[in-house]
Amino acid sequence: MHPIVAKAQLSPNVTRLVIEAPRIAEIRQPGQFVIVRRGPGGERIPLTIADVDKAAGTITLVIQAIGKTTHELTSLNVGDAITDVAGPLGNPTKLLEAGHAVCVGGGVGTAVVYPIAQALARNGVKVTSIIGGRSKEWVICEDELRACGDVIICTDDGSYGRHGFVTEALKDLCDAGGVDEVYAVGPVPMMRACSELTRPYAIKTTVSLNSIMIDGTGMCGGCRVAIDGKTEYACVDGPEFDGHKVDFRQMADRLTTYREFEQTALERWTTAHAAAPGAAGATSHAEADR
């Protein structure tokens, strides 16, 4: 059991949970993730470890409420517990050793690029982070990323920072020169757009793929992705890959495989949750892209 020791709402549908997991906190490296199961018989889902506190023995998970399981997790409160947390899994981020790195985060992907930006800054690399959100209330992890270097904020409606997409700010930086590597995490269309943008500049671009995943150890094959025409597995070969080699169209198609079943499960959970005693005070979460 992994008790929840802190909870915070970062945006209308993104929640931060800090849970006890001392063994994972001790050995986790940036870019790695855990497989979480709320309770017996529950769905297993991958979540990136956004931060750790080795002294306290805790890890931080940032969760976007989209389907039944993520809604269930974000409805938990301090004192509740998550039954199973397996990890750390996946390969650590291959960090740029010197120069200028640009970390691009879209939506909840911003929480995934934060530990990368943090590690880069600690290694003396110049870090510029670009954060994207629909509007000001959807921008997350701004303070954390400002502690790592310069930050450019882009909102779709112009309510905060620049009016426009993260790719527009990224293009400006690429045009100015001096960018040695880009790390991009967010919705598949965003990662694809960032990768296509940097291709003519020959700037290495690393993306983190949040594929459908069950065991996280390469046994089920559910997280397979096409990389440079070859099949690889996000759990054991990734989760990070060269964005210029990823077949984003295939990945986007695979992510919709169980959409109908996911929607049915969410509707059933929402109905049951609304009918449960004390549900009137429960937090409501809107749906959004990753």
Residue spans for each PLM region:
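Short, Lys/Arg- and Gly-enriched loop/turn segments at beta-strand edges
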Residues: 42-51, 89-99, 235
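Ferredoxin-reductase
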Residues: 1-78
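FNR/FR-type flavoprotein reductase catalytic core
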Residues: 68-214
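A generic structural signal for residues embedded in beta-strands
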Residues: 36, 84-85, 225
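Iron-sulfur (Fe-S) cluster-binding segments and ferredoxin-like electron-carrier domains
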Residues: 195-196, 200-201, 222-260, 274-276, ...
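Local cysteine-cluster metal-coordination motifs and their immediate loop/turn environment
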Residues: 112, 188-190, 210-240
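Short, surface-exposed secondary-structure boundary micro-motifs
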Residues: 39, 87-88, 228
